[in-house]
Amino acid sequence: MQDNSQTRVVVGMSGGVDSSVVALRLKQQGYDVIGVFMKNWDDTDENGVCTATEDYKDVAKVAAKIGIPYYSVNFEKEYWDRVFTYFLDEYKKGRTPNPDVICNKEIKFKAFLDYALELGADYIATGHYAQLTRDEAGHAHLMRAVDQNKDQTYFLSQLSTEQLDRVMFPIGDLVKPQVREIAKEAGLATAEKKDSMGICFIGEKGHFKDFLKTYLPAKAGDMMTVDGEIKGHHAGLMYYTIGQRKGLGIGGDGIDNEPWFVIGKDLQKNILYVGKGYHNPHLYATHLSASDIHWVNTIDRGSDFHCTAKFRYRQKDTGVTVHLNDDGQQVTVEFDDPARAITPGQAVVFYNGDECLGSAIIDAAYNQERELQLI
């Protein structure tokens, strides 16, 4: 059996069952394990509803049960500067950001990795559902988890091979029921703890409008069809996302009684465009443009290549052709079949089979040459 006792692994422990089992498995495999709880948001803030105190108590219970030292580290400033300000800036632009992608890139696999290295870590480990393979040169390749329903490579798609070379994902080969069973058999306090949902700083109940207007002024405006018919009024463009159905305040009408969906925004005129029907043609795009391109591995794929992509978490893969612009900073993604509700600000994540190649941030979606969101 391999002697891992000289290899130090610092585990990011959230107080949940996944990271608890990560720490347990590594300890059982003989690694020198240290647990670290990250505090990224001030939950004493009048709007914060995170449960950091209770989560830290659970980390302490699990660490004591496993028999590992544990610490707490505060990344509130880094989170505010690198993640939260980005989140607000994107909403100001009328886009719908994904803070989890940026949090992984900037906090969990940058600030935390730097902190772990100061503790003498050889690797960090997290409870993400993903897998890594190493090529002949020893470099890491990001692969989907065995549990396809829980796979989190979408959120890890902005990581670099340099970061991943220092990372372990010890539960990527398990499905969620197995993780809970392992925790239960080991008597871990988190075995039955429910999964955390939603964005840390908003909390699980997701009073999103109330939270957002604390930081950004809302400006009400008209809600109308592409033909100029006013159907109602919106509370502020930042509260709506492309393809949204709920919360519009306008039900189906007429013979067909089809529901209404958000199909576009005009930031300059402060207009929210709506259209009837799930299959409204204004919701379907033939291609998109994206920037902030990031490849996990710096392999030359040429300027054009075919692969699959996801435009949101847990979506089925879509066949696409990727066209890299000459400057290498922007990309055009052409869909094999029209795709619905492509949302600026979200990540488009590229795959080759089970390998996550990287991602870019969506700027605009088009139907032929017409930009959809601007109608």
From Swiss-Prot:
Q: Where is this region: Interaction with target base in tRNA?
A: 98-100
Q: EC number(s)?
A: 2.8.1.13
Task: Name which cysteines form disulfide bonds.
Answer: C103-C200
Q: Name the chemical reaction catalysed here.
A: S-sulfanyl-L-cysteinyl-[protein] + uridine(34) in tRNA + AH2 + ATP = 2-thiouridine(34) in tRNA + L-cysteinyl-[protein] + A + AMP + diphosphate + H(+)
Give the CC-aspect GO terms: cytoplasm
Q: Which GO terms describe its biological process?
A: tRNA wobble position uridine thiolation
> Keywords in UniProt for this one?
ATP-binding, Cytoplasm, Disulfide bond, Nucleotide-binding, RNA-binding, Transferase, tRNA processing, tRNA-binding
Renumbered to this chain, region (Interaction with tRNA) spans 150-152, 312-313
Q: In which family does this protein belong, per the annotation? A: Belongs to the MnmA/TRMU family.
Functional description taken from the UniProt entry: Catalyzes the 2-thiolation of uridine at the wobble position (U34) of tRNA, leading to the formation of s(2)U34.
Q: What is this protein called?
A: tRNA-specific 2-thiouridylase MnmA
- Species: Levilactobacillus brevis (strain ATCC 367 / BCRC 12310 / CIP 105137 / JCM 1170 / LMG 11437 / NCIMB 947 / NCTC 947)
